[in-house]
Amino acid sequence: MPVNLIAVQPSDLLPVPGVRVGVAEAGIRKANRRDLTLIELAAGSRVAGVFTLNRFCAAPVQLCKQHIAGGDVRALVINTGVANAGTGEQGLADAHATCVAVGRTLGVAPEQVLPFSTGVILEALPVDRLIAGLPAAHADLREDGWFDAAHAIMTTDTLAKAVSRQVEIGGRTVTLTGISKGAGMIKPNMATMLGFLACDAAVSQALLDALTKEAADLSFNSITVDGDTSTNDSFIVVATGQAGNAEIADPLGSDFHALRDAVIDVSIRLAQAIVRDGEGATKFMTIAVEGGLDVVECRKVAYAIGQSPLVKTAFFASDPNLGRILAAIGYAGIQDLDVGGLRVWLGTAAEEVLVAELGGRAPTYREEDGVRVMKEAEITVRVDLGRGRARATVWTCDFSYDYVKINADYRS
Amino acid sequence: MPVNLIAVQPSDLLPVPGVRVGVAEAGIRKANRRDLTLIELAAGSRVAGVFTLNRFCAAPVQLCKQHIAGGDVRALVINTGVANAGTGEQGLADAHATCVAVGRTLGVAPEQVLPFSTGVILEALPVDRLIAGLPAAHADLREDGWFDAAHAIMTTDTLAKAVSRQVEIGGRTVTLTGISKGAGMIKPNMATMLGFLACDAAVSQALLDALTKEAADLSFNSITVDGDTSTNDSFIVVATGQAGNAEIADPLGSDFHALRDAVIDVSIRLAQAIVRDGEGATKFMTIAVEGGLDVVECRKVAYAIGQSPLVKTAFFASDPNLGRILAAIGYAGIQDLDVGGLRVWLGTAAEEVLVAELGGRAPTYREEDGVRVMKEAEITVRVDLGRGRARATVWTCDFSYDYVKINADYRS
C-alpha cells in the first residue's frame, strides 16, 4: 500500500510545448503490456542528466553519457522488462542498435538519442522486438502522452508517478511535467530509479547542467528504500526553450531562482513518490538533520538513521524507539560528535515532540507522546547536531514483513 | 534457529590458570535469572581491549577505557538487563559505584575493575541491586565458572557462546577460553556484542595490545548482522602469565605466532557464533573478497554484499540472485573498479561454482548449479577483484521474516 500517494489523473498532467510522447506494447519481456516509451524533443531543446555511480553501469547508461555530452539530443527511448545491464559488448551493441533505429524513425542521428532500460539484469535485450515496436510508439506521439508514459515506465511500481506545475518566468508561463519510476527493487534484480522532467523554459546549458545536478542531489539522491543502488539509475531534465522567456543565463537572477525552485519542487515530489511506493512501505519518514558543520555530515547522520534496519523495523511497529535512533546517530561516522550537544524530535504535521537532549532521553519526554506521533503514517525525525549551520534532508520508508516477502518470494 | 551452532557443554570449556569466574542472580531487570558475572584475575595478569566507536559510548565503556589504560586490572564485572548507555552523568556515577563495590569485595582498587553492561539503553542502572548481588557472585568464584558465565552474559542470544583450546608455546601448554554474546540487537534496543578471552600465556603488554586489535579486526569487526553498531561493544583479552612460558616479546618469533594463531582462531569462532545465532538467521554466509589493492577496499566490497538487504533476502529465499551481488559490488565505493576484471563464485564445503566473469554471467554458469549451492545452510560468496593481492573476509547471515518479526514485535 503506497503511503499517501494518490493515483495521478490524465488531467493532472500538462503538455510541455516542444515535447511529444508515445508508448507501445513491444513485448520486450511480457506480452500485452506497454513497455516502450518514445519521447521526441523539438529542435533547440537542451538536455542535462545525472546517472548511477554503480560500477556495473548498464550499457544504455554508458551510451547516454556519451550522447548527452555531444549535445543536440532529440529523443529519449525507454524500455521496461530488461535492463540491459551486465551484458558486456553485446549490451552496448544492442543499445546502439536501439539508437540507430530511433534515429531512423525520427530522422535524427543515433547520437541524438538517449536510451534507457529498466528490468532484469544479466539478460540480453531483445532488441529486435524493441525495434519492431518503434513504429507504434512513433504513431502514438502526442503532447498529452505523459499519462501513458508514466504507466509505461512502471516495473514493480504499484502506482504511476507524475507531477506537473507551472511558474511565471520573465512574464511567460513555464510548464514543467515529470514522471518517475522505482519502488525498491525490480524482479528479479535491482530497483532502477528513472526520472524524466521536461519544461519549456529557455535556459543556458551551463545553468541547466548545474540545476540538474542540484535537483538530483536534493531529490533522487536524498531518498533511500533499502540502501542499494541500481545499475541503471538516471535523471534527465529537458528544457525546450519554447516558453518565449528570455534565455536564463544569470545564476543570481530572479528568473533562474524561479526555475530552480520549480524544478527542485517537481524533482522532490517525483522522488518522494518512489519512497511512498517503496516495497512494503507503511510509513513515510522524513529525516531532517540540521546544525551540522557541513552538508556531508548532515547526510551521513540522515542516512545512518534512514538506512538502519533496526530504526526502520521500529517505525513499522509504530515504536518510538529512541535508543535505535540515537545509536544510529552515534555510529554515523562523525568522529568528534559531542552527543551531549544534540537534540532529537519526533514530529508530524500537527506536533513535534522533543525526545532527546544532553546525551539521553529529554526530561520532558513522555512515552505516550512518542507513541502518539509514531501512529501516524507521515513522521519526521528532526536532529539538531548543535555544531554548525548546515542541514540535509533524506526521505525513507519503514521496513515491513512485506519487504522481506516481496524480495524473497518473487520466484515462487 | 541458530545455523550450525551447537550447545556448548561444561566439559568443552577449560579453566585458565589465574582466572576465577562467578555468577549470581542480582535481579537487575528481571528476577530469577543469572544476570551478574564476576571475573577475578590473578596478580600480574595483563589485559587489553577494544571498544565500540559509537559516539553514544556507554558509561561503563568510558570507565573501561580509563581503567585499562592504568594497567594492573584485577577484575571484570558484567551485568545484563540494563546497558547503562545514554544515561549521562548518573550513568558514569553508577558505573563508578559498581567498580568501587567490586574493588571492596575483592580487595583491589576501583581503577583495577573493568565494568561491562548490556541490555536496554536510556534506562538507569539499578546499581543497588547490582551491588547487593556481588557477594553471591564472589562466593561463586571458581576456575570452572566459564560455562555459567557464558549463560549469564546472554541477552537475546538463543545459545551460549564459548570456546576453549590449547596450544604448545615454548614447551608449555597454554590454555585459551573465551565467551561471547550478541545476536543482532537486544530488547528493546541495540545489540551489544561482548567478547572475553582469557589465556595463561606470558606475553608483553605491547604484543597483547597489538594482538587484541588484530584479533578484533579479524573477528568481531568482520561480522555483520544488520549493520548497526552498539553503544557497548567490547572485546577483552586477558593473559595471566601462569603457563610458565618465557614471556613472549618478539613479534617475529614462533612463540608469538603460535599465540597469535590461537587467539585469532578462538576470536573468530566466538564472533562467528554471534552470526550463527543472528536474529532470524537461517543461513551462515562467508563473504571472501580477494585480489584487492588493499584490505580497506576488500572490506568495502565484502560489507556491501554482506549488508545488502536485497542480497540477504535472496539468501533467505535460497535464490542464486547474481544480479544483486554484482550490483552490491558495483556500489561498494571502488571508484576505478573494472567490472570486466572481476570474478564471483558461490560455494559450499563441497563445491565452488563460478557465476560471474567479464562483467556479467559466466558462460559456464548454469542456474541449477547456483540453486544447488544456495540450498545449503553455509554458503561462501568469493569475489576476486582482479587488481591486487589484498584480501578480507566478512561473515553474515540472511534476512528473514523472523528478523522483522523479532525487531518489530518485541513490545507485544
UniProtKB/Swiss-Prot annotation, chains A, B:
Q: Which major enzyme category is it?
A: transferase
| Highest taxon of source | Bacteria
Q: Does the keyword Cytoplasm apply?
A: yes
Which residues are annotated as active site?
A: T192
Q: In this UniProt entry, which residues are annotated as the site Cleavage?
A: A191, T192
* Example GO BP: ornithine biosynthetic process
Q: Which pairs of positions does the record mark as disulfide bonds?
A: none
**Reactions catalysed:** N(2)-acetyl-L-ornithine + L-glutamate = N-acetyl-L-glutamate + L-ornithine; L-glutamate + acetyl-CoA = N-acetyl-L-glutamate + CoA + H(+)
- What pathway is this protein a component of? Amino-acid biosynthesis; L-arginine biosynthesis; L-ornithine and N-acetyl-L-glutamate from L-glutamate and N(2)-acetyl-L-ornithine (cyclic): step 1/1; Amino-acid biosynthesis; L-arginine biosynthesis; N(2)-acetyl-L-ornithine from L-glutamate: step 1/4
EC numbers for this chain: 2.3.1.35, 2.3.1.1
Q: Does the keyword Ribonucleoprotein apply?
A: no
Q: Which UniProt keywords apply?
A: Acyltransferase, Amino-acid biosynthesis, Arginine biosynthesis, Autocatalytic cleavage, Cytoplasm, Multifunctional enzyme, Transferase
The entry assigns this protein to a family as follows: Belongs to the ArgJ family.
Q: Which NCBIfam families match?
A: ArgJ (TIGR00120), PRK05388.1 (NF003802)
Which HAMAP family does this entry report, sorted A to Z? Answer: ArgJ
What is the role of this chain?
Catalyzes two activities which are involved in the cyclic version of arginine biosynthesis: the synthesis of N-acetylglutamate from glutamate and acetyl-CoA as the acetyl donor, and of ornithine by transacetylation between N(2)-acetylornithine and glutamate.
**What's the name of the protein?**
Arginine biosynthesis bifunctional protein ArgJ
**Which organism does this sequence originate in?**
Aromatoleum aromaticum (strain DSM 19018 / LMG 30748 / EbN1)
